């Protein structure tokens, strides 16, 4: 069984909606999913390692959402060893209005997680809020990402 923890950074609730849709689509599968808002966690969420999905919007001029900021800052300042962490990444942003800082919050998380030894599985999904329904695009991306996770981690799907 694959245990997946989705960590959500959101300013207006869209990233949380995306995480909820992913959780709904995985309901009834052999994947155990637990979703947590970054507002309510600290770096100890990574204790013991595992598979994580970072799902975050970008706020303002490329900023991490307000509620996720303490969590992000703790990673920057305490620099825990995350070599036993595997993760995927979904970034949400507005390419039309903020092209220069499109999905910067997700890119910031990707950078710090990599620096701390975590290993990203697959390519990130960067969703432009002007082109697609983020929850539908994320759910579609998730199908391929789960296959890649299982392959890289040597976990077979149960019937």
Predicted regions mapped to residue ranges:
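FMN-binding flavodoxin-like domain, especially the glycine-rich phosphate-binding loop
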Residues: 2-5, 13-17, 25, 29, ...
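A short, well-structured beta->alpha microelement
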Residues: 29-43
């Amino acid at each position: 069984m694959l245990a997946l923890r989705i960590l959500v950074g959101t300013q207006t609730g869209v990233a949380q909606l995306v995480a909820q849709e992913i959780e709904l689509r995985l309901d009834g599968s052999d994947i155990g999913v637990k979703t947590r808002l970054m507002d309510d966690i600290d770096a100890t969420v990574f204790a013991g390692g595992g598979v994580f999905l970072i799902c975050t919007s970008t706020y303002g001029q490329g900023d991490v959402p307000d509620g996720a900021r303490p969590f992000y800052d703790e990673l920057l300042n305490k620099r825990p060893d995350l070599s036993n962490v595997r993760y995927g990444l979904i970034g949400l942003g507005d390419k039309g209005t903020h092209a220069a800082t499109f999905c910067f919050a997700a890119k910031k998380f990707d950078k710090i997680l990599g620096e701390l030894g975590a290993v990203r599985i697959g390519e990130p999904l960067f969703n432009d809020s002007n082109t697609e329904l983020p929850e539908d695009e994320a759910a579609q991306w998730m199908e391929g990402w789960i296959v890649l996770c299982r392959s890289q981690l040597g976990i077979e799907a149960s019937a």
